[in-house]
């Protein structure tokens, strides 16, 4: 289905290019599939001297998907998703965590050729209600994102965005943090080169500060991707990602502060196996 998509998708291409898969931790993920369909994913992440783990089970039956996650903090998170249950383009999501009794939430997503609507409400006595929408076409869209805390009767957030897309570029403008910050992002595919570039500029009105991040990625071959980025603080990062088996990836990334070269750089590695 065409259309503007959801509000959360505005500027996502640039963010993925600039931030996705960069890490300084050591992460290992293993996904297995049982004979009758359910998928089980185990993840272990080492952050400095701390190791955290998570195990996830996913079961699909027609248009119903059930995800159950358990982590090393003794939390169990369940998400039930129903696609096209009441009407075409409508997705219903129920999520809750144990033992957090205030974590329950119901979410509705609706995609149309000229609109993408997302509404959610917490399952508590005084819930937070969130409503976001993107309106327009796949080429030009405007959107807004609002959250109301019914306990205080105050807006927890109100944001707005504008997006322009054509065959090889995506540009977006986001007004965030209740109007306190303005972010412009840009994503461009260099024709027939396997290369994409992106940039993100954020201005804070309250502090009058700017932050700029520029990045690029290049497909060396169908199985290998390299990325690099640098920001105005002088932090530079690079990664290489290789698909060594179908759907199995090895990603090595590094970060260095160019203004303090004498400090040791940070290196992260992530291995995702899907045998």
Swiss-Prot record:
What InterPro entries does the record point to? Porin_dom_sf, Porin_Euk, Porin_Euk/Tom40
Q: Which ranges form a coiled coil?
A: none
What are its GO cellular component terms? mitochondrial outer membrane; pore complex
Question: What main location does UniProt list?
Answer: mitochondrion
A single GO molecular function term of this UniProt record: voltage-gated monoatomic anion channel activity
Gene3D superfamilies tied to this protein: Porin
| Database matches in Pfam families | Porin_3
The protein's name in its UniProt record: Mitochondrial outer membrane porin
Family according to the record: Belongs to the eukaryotic mitochondrial porin (TC 1.B.8.1) family.
> Where does this protein reside within or beyond the cell?
Mitochondrion outer membrane
Protein function: Forms a channel through the cell membrane that allows diffusion of small hydrophilic molecules. The channel adopts an open conformation at low or zero membrane potential and a closed conformation at potentials above 30-40 mV. The open state has a weak anion selectivity whereas the closed state is cation-selective.
Q: What is known of its domains?
A: Consists mainly of membrane-spanning sided beta-sheets.
Q: Which UniProt keywords apply?
A: Ion transport, Membrane, Mitochondrion, Mitochondrion outer membrane, Porin, Transmembrane, Transmembrane beta strand, Transport
Domain of life of the source: Eukaryota
């Amino acid at each position: 289905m065409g259309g503007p998509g959801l509000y959360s998708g505005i500027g996502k291409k640039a963010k993925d290019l600039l931030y996705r898969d960069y890490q300084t931790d050591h992460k290992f993920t293993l996904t297995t599939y049982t004979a009758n369909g359910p998928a089980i994913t185990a993840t272990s992440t080492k952050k400095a001297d701390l190791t955290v783990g998570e195990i996830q089970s996913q079961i699909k039956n027609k248009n119903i998907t059930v995800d159950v996650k358990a982590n090393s903090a003794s939390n169990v998170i369940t998400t039930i998703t129903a696609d096209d249950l009441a009407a075409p383009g409508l997705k219903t999501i129920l999520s809750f965590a144990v033992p957090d009794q205030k974590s329950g939430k119901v979410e509705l997503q609706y995609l149309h050729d000229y609109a993408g609507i997302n509404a959610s409400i917490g399952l508590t006595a005084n819930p937070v209600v969130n409503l976001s929408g993107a309106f327009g076409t796949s080429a030009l869209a405007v959107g807004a994102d609002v959250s109301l805390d019914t306990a205080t009767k105050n807006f927890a957030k109100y944001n707005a965005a504008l997006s322009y897309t054509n065959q090889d570029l995506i540009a977006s403008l986001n007004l965030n943090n209740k109007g306190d910050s303005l972010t412009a992002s840009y994503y461009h595919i260099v024709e027939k080169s396997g290369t994409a570039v992106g940039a993100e500029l954020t201005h804070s009105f309250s502090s009058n500060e700017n932050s700029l991040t520029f990045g690029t990625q290049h497909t060396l071959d169908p199985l290998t991707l390299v990325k690099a980025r640098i920001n105005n603080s002088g932090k530079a990062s690079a990664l290489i990602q290789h698909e060594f088996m179908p759907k199995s990836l090895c990603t090595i990334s590094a970060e260095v502060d160019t203004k303090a070269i004498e400090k040791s750089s940070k290196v992260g590695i992530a291995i995702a196996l899907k045998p």
